[in-house]
């Protein structure tokens, strides 16, 4: 999957979210007799759905929509063709392609279409019958730097060809980042920079060493651009946003079987320097610009072909109803295909998600037999069967990914089947230490107790002459393992265990939760259950640089609320001193904060109020300027700041005397009601703090989005009367609308 980090910082265009979907690639094929380890994955741009039961009963007529994807009339420099091109039948399309279709009012929108109530939806080989779309949105062409902004080599200014200048600019724009300080990143960048420089005809200086390059002038230019962007007025930002939305609008949706569906990633990735995750060997390499000639479109037969940018033509046109991508191209870094597909909230993606979770749910009917069988196979006389059983055990019990072989130019991440000698340490009688880099180069480190026979098998798998670098499971691959699992259940693969165990664990955790407490308390309980799943799946994350500041802000907020509560209770005593005699426990916390602590709180509150007043003054003036009204003066602002300063003096006087005068119109009952409100806020904020600290190193979102059946979250929301908005973000509510609409509180995984 493409990483949003790969967006070039020197581009002012928006981030792109192109995904690389593995389901478009065939399963790796075995060499020879099937026992040899697969050394290289074979890629293909085409894959077919496994469901072949029924065909759609009716073909819906497609209303035609006017294609409005006129691309800016800016010249695009000559394309750089990737090393390999897709082996597909190409239909060249010139810039004068078919006219755009007329838009009709009869187009059915996807909104409100409940595909999960259609028994035939998603069945059969063909995923759609009619498909129209407007192609893809290309990033803006490169804008050369001003003549005074140059790369320097040994103190001399360098006149670079346009493409070489562009590549140098990508490095300069991120020169202060950790990536740019990585020696591997620097070397890969410099190698590609020299190659691009050679392609462009060279320059006036003989550049040979990275250490002699001075990017400071370029870096300063990009920093100035960033500062200018930050200092834009609200009106300017709004104008840019509207222009961007207008440009993107034609590409956001497509027409599939007469319904308008959202497109998930309609932008072509901009060029830049590849970053990658973890210790990726290709970090820093130049990700080249993608041109129309590199792109193949998938459309319905007879559908109007979107016109390519002027002077270009599409690489090919396909009419493949068995796949759901709209466009594809080969990316030069990983030499794999990237696909433009429908959005997460589309009907096609929804049915895919539902089938995934239903497949995992069906596993509960087979899991006991599978476990009984692999326990027997652990002692099988054939070594391959022992390895299959041992791998299945590890995948089932410890939620390991299946894993596959990686090339030398890929990050050294592993899963169960690709574990090597050095990744497993054995401690008799039955303890195993796993230590390896998993997906996204996240370290998997666990010391666990395993079945005695599993321990014995692992010891056998590590026997001499094996040593560091040798495969532990040298008789199996994920393909062999999955073929074995297919005997138990249609669609069962190693990764289904992960979804099953994540959802089963969530169900078990939810069964332990009592329906008590406030909404905030229930959300914390839900997150604790989610965290158990995330830990099982090893969904870690690095503690953010801002974590300590975020925790401090929440702690400060709690202290401010405690101070507010003390002030309110002192107001009660100002009205009726006998309250303290009648209920001394209620007033015990009056001395919880020292005068020094309260002074610090007051200064913080006052500074925030002043800052808010200045920001509001600026916002109001922006609005008045747009509406051509008289602007507020500095005197107006100063008047507000003076009032805030008076409040500050009053607060400090309260701290000094210990007396807080009740506000006009206050009563004991109204003040007690306010105290209760503040106490509830303290409780809720404390839960927020606990959540923040508990989940600082655990990523809850990954398991919630990909592994926990969303219907479990819906059940929790309905059963415990928690608004679904507290558990699912807007994105997840859209993605899992099918679960929200079709699940009641009695559903079980």
UniProtKB/Swiss-Prot annotation:
Source organism: Candidozyma auris (Yeast)
State the family it belongs to.
Answer: Belongs to the type IB topoisomerase family.
Q: Where is the composition biased (Basic and acidic residues)?
A: 62-75, 101-110
Q: Name the Gene3D superfamilies on file.
A: 1.10.132.10, DNA Topoisomerase I, domain 2 (2.170.11.10), Topoisomerase I, Chain A, domain 3 (3.90.15.10), Yeast DNA topoisomerase - domain 1 (1.10.10.41)
Specify one Pfam family. Answer: Topoisom_I
Reactions catalysed, semicolon-separated, are: ATP-independent breakage of single-stranded DNA, followed by passage and rejoining
Q: Where is this site: Interaction with DNA?
A: 277, 325, 356, 413, 439, 482, 539, 557
- The EC number(s) given in the record are 5.6.2.1
Q: Which residues form the Topo IB-type catalytic domain?
A: 345-749
What's this protein's name? Answer: DNA topoisomerase 1
This chain's function reads: Releases the supercoiling and torsional tension of DNA introduced during the DNA replication and transcription by transiently cleaving and rejoining one strand of the DNA duplex. Introduces a single-strand break via transesterification at the specific target site 5'-[CT]CCTTp site in duplex DNA. The scissile phosphodiester is attacked by the catalytic tyrosine of the enzyme, resulting in the formation of a DNA-(3'-phosphotyrosyl)-enzyme intermediate and the expulsion of a 5'-OH DNA strand. The free DNA strand then undergoes passage around the unbroken strand thus removing DNA supercoils.
Coiled-coil stretches are none
- The catalytic residues are 707 (o-(3'-phospho-dna)-tyrosine intermediate)
Q: Kindly list the residue ranges recorded as spanning the membrane.
A: none
Instruction: Name the enzyme group at the top EC level.
Output: isomerase
For region Interaction with DNA, the annotated ranges are 338-339, 401-406, 493-495
Residue spans of biased composition, Low complexity class: 79-94
List the top taxonomic levels of the source: Eukaryota, Fungi, Dikarya, Ascomycota, Saccharomycotina
One GO MF annotation is: DNA topoisomerase type I (single strand cut, ATP-independent) activity
């Amino acid at each position: 999957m493409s990483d949003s980090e790969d967006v070039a910082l020197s581009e002012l265009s928006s981030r792109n979210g192109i995904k690389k979907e593995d389901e478009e690639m065939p399963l790796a094929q075995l060499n020879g007799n099937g026992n040899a380890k697969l050394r290289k994955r074979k890629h293909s741009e085409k894959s077919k759905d496994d469901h072949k039961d029924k065909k759609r009963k009716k073909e819906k007529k497609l209303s035609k929509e006017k294609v409005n994807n006129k691309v800016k009339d800016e010249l695009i420099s000559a394309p750089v063709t990737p090393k390999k091109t897709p082996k597909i039948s190409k239909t060249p399309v010139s810039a004068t392609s078919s006219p755009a279709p007329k838009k009709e009012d009869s187009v059915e929108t996807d909104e409100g279409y409940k595909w999960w109530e259609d028994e035939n939806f998603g069945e059969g080989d063909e995923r759609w019958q009619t498909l129209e779309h407007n192609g893809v949105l290309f990033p803006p062409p490169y804008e050369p730097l001003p003549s005074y902004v140059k790369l320097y080599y040994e103190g001399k200014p360098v006149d670079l060809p346009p493409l070489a200048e562009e590549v140098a600019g990508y490095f300069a724009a991120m020169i202060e980042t950790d990536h740019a300080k990585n020696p591997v990143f620097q070397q890969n960048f410099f190698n590609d920079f020299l190659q691009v420089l050679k392609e462009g005809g060279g320059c006036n200086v003989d550049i040979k060493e990275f250490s002699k390059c001075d990017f400071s002038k370029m870096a300063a230019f990009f920093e100035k651009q960033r500062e200018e962007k930050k200092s834009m007025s609200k009106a300017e930002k709004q104008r840019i946003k509207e222009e961007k939305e207008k440009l993107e609008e034609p590409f956001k949706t497509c027409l599939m079987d007469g319904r308008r569906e959202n497109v998930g990633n309609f932008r072509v990735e901009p060029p830049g320097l590849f970053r990658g995750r973890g210790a990726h060997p290709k970090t820093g390499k130049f990700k080249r610009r993608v041109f129309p000639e590199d792109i193949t479109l998938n459309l319905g037969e007879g559908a109007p072909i979107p016109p390519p940018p002027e002077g270009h033509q599409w690489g090919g046109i396909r009419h493949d109803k068995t796949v759901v991508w709209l466009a594809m191209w080969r990316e030069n870094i990983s030499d794999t295909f990237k696909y433009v597909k429908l959005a997460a909230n589309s009907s096609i993606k929804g049915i895919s998600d539902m089938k995934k979770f239903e497949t995992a749910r069906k596993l509960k009917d087979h899991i006991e037999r599978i476990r009984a069988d692999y326990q027997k196979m652990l002692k099988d006389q054939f070594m391959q069967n022992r390895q299959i059983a041992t791998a299945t055990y590890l995948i089932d019990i410890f939620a390991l990914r299946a894993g596959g072989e990686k090339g030398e130019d890929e990050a050294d991440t592993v899963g169960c089947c690709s574990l090597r000698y050095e990744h497993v340490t054995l401690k008799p009688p039955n303890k195993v230490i796993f230590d390896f880099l998993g997906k996204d180069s996240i370290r998997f480190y666990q010391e666990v107790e395993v079945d005695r026979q599993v321990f014995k098998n692992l010891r056998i798998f590590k026997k001499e002459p094996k040593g560091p670098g040798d495969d532990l499971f040298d008789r199996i691959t994920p393909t062999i393992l999955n073929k074995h699992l297919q005997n138990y259940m249609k669609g069962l693969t190693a990764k289904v265990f992960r979804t099953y165990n994540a959802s089963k664990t969530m169900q078990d955790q939810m069964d332990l939760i009592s329906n008590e407490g406030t909404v905030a308390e229930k959300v914390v309980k839900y997150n604790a259950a989610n965290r158990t799943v995330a830990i099982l799946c090893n969904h870690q994350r690095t503690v953010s640089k801002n974590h300590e500041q975020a925790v401090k802000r929440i702690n400060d907020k709690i202290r401010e609320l405690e101070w507010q509560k003390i002030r309110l209770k002192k107001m009660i005593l100002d009205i009726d001193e006998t309250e303290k005699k009648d209920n001394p426990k209620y007033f015990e916390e009056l001395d919880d904060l020292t005068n020094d602590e309260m002074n610090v709180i007051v200064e913080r509150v006052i500074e925030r109020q002043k800052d808010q007043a200045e920001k509001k003054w600026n916002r109001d003036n922006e609005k008045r300027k747009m509406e051509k009204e008289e602007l507020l003066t500095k005197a107006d602002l100063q008047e507000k700041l003076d009032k805030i300063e008076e409040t500050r003096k009053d607060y400090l006087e309260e701290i000094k005397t210990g007396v807080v005068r009740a506000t006009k119109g206050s009563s004991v009952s109204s003040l007690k009601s306010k105290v209760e409100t503040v106490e509830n806020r303290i409780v809720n904020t404390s839960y927020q703090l606990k959540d923040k600290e508990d989940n600082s190193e655990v990523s809850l979102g990954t398991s919630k989005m990909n592994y926990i059946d969303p219907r479990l979250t819906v059940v929790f929301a309905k059963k415990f009367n928690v608004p679904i908005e507290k558990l699912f973000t807007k994105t997840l509510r859209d993605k899992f609308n099918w679960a929200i609409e079709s699940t009641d509180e009695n559903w079980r995984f």
